Amino acid sequence: MTEAENRVTLGFEAEVKQLLHLMIHSLYGNKEIFLRELISNASDAADKLRFSALGNDALYEGDSRLRVRIEFDKAARTLSISDNGIGMTREEVQHNIGTIARSGTRHFFESLTGDEAKDSQLIGQFGVGFYSAFIVADKVVLETRKAGVPAEEGARWESSGEGSYTLETLTRPERGTRVTLHLREGEDEFLDGWKLRAIIRKFSDHISLPIEMKRETGEPKEGEEAPAEVWETVNSASALWAKNRDEITDEAYDEFYKHVSHDFQEPLARVHSRVEGTNEYTLLLYIPKHAPFDLWDRDSKRGVKLYVRKVFIMEDSDKLMPRYLRFVRGVIDSDSLPLNVSREILQENKQLEKIRGGAVKKVLGLLEDLANNEPEKYQAFWKEFGQVLKEGLIEDFANKDRLAKLLRFSSTHTDSEEQTVTLDEYVSRMKEGQDKIYFVSAESFGAARNSPHLEIFRKKDIEVLLLSDRIDEWLVSYLTEYEGKPLQSVARGDLDLGKLEGEEEKAEAAAEKEAFAPLTERLKKALEAKVNDVRLSHRLTDSPACLISESYGMSRTMERIMKSAGQNIPGSKPILEINPHHGLIARLNTEADQTRFQDLASLLLDQAVLAEGGQLDDPAEFVHKLNGLLQSLL
């Protein structure tokens, strides 16, 4: 390969250029974090080598003492962070550093506001890693070689962070990665050994890998030999989770969270526990304050790291946490699993299943503690992760009852979009004689709150849960009852209020049904292509009509959700309910002109579709008929 073929200049993805610009301008006030991020990357590289070497000891290449080294050169104005971890191939360098191959990237950039304070928080949630070097450097050089490949297959990457980078192959005897920062003018504080040591102890003291710096001895006197280089370990280099809880400060806990999560903010809550017995393990788990941008990527592997006797094994969240707890971050360290455990063995490992089950119980216990003792914190959690936690009712039957108590809903009692109502609170407010938990589902809070199906419930002051999250339709198909009380949709099947309806009301309804039987039959015939039946409604007090589903059929909301997702759902016809006390229905009951009756019936059905948040099959026809009706009134 010629030099021209070996050395190539490539452009960053547009997202990388935007991220670099944002970091330099938004994170400068917290610029020390670049060192934490680069040390964290080096630590991850060492973890990956340890795991790979479990099956191939030759990857250590005779050097199994893993460490991170920090060096600076005042004359050259450079700061270097090097490790002897797994390293990268040239192709991996191009993929990992030239692009942002991460779910949620587009949503991240759409969320940026232009407000530096807010954007810096968003950037912290997204995680910047390697790119943070450009906060203090105007040029960054990375040299690396992957463990187990020949020295001639190293790679060198260089960029000034302005839109492009160069990449070339080089000979590198040392395994691992070295990142050299050419510091900007005014960043001299990062050329001070004492300052660097202070930053390391502040941000990275908890890392179990030794972080080393050369002992500073000063310039030798004339005629004296320069003293031999001595590397000193700066951090405590012990696994934080292995310490007793009373030995760990809140600050140390928070910094460890930032290390394992690559989040810039402190966590919302944590649990640190040691489980002893036949299956011994330690866990240190955190709940973030904010949802990561890949929260809805169910295939994301980031989450909880598994260690065996302080040796990193994997970061594969669904092996250690169910998918509905994929937001949890932290570590689990087992004393009982074999050190040479493989991912294949872990698939069916009973010990790991018990560890997973125990970890889930600890997380649910932490959430219960927040809900009972720190409701404001729990409400902050619910706002970020509530929709994900709802998946647990579908996935985790064993913990279904515990999860049900953690649910929060909007309801007609609070009349607020904020989901604060528990099922226990709902049950405590149930009317005398009420034996069901009522809910209405819609595709938005506004549509649920203004649903015509609520009218009789508002009149009788009966609370109804307002469900508008996309997962809610699946939720209520699994959560069919709570504390012996069935959940009942107010928009499905015949409405039976039982003891909430007096005998006089029931007698009046029976009389109305008989009196309006000719009209319901006439409407049913006029709309037979679009509705399955026409009935008198006991739900409506103000609206002329509404649509309902059969008791055991798919709900109207679920049909729309499935169709919007591209699912081929067999068409089903709804039931049209009419309000016998509404003026429009009274007018229809006396309409003799069949053409006019047909138009009014179509308009009645179409407005019922619109009232529930649906879409018309033929909006133009609706407008045409409505205009005709309006003209006839002039």
From Swiss-Prot:
Keywords: ATP-binding, Chaperone, Cytoplasm, Nucleotide-binding, Stress response. The keyword Nucleotidyltransferase does not apply. Residues 1-343 are annotated as: A. It comes from the Bacteria. It holds the Pfam family HSP90. Residues 344-560 are annotated as: B. PROSITE patterns: HSP90. GO terms for cellular component: cytoplasm. Belongs to the heat shock protein 90 family. This is Chaperone protein HtpG. It comes from Methylococcus capsulatus (strain ATCC 33009 / NCIMB 11132 / Bath). The lineage of its organism: Bacteria, Pseudomonadati, Pseudomonadota, Gammaproteobacteria, Methylococcales.
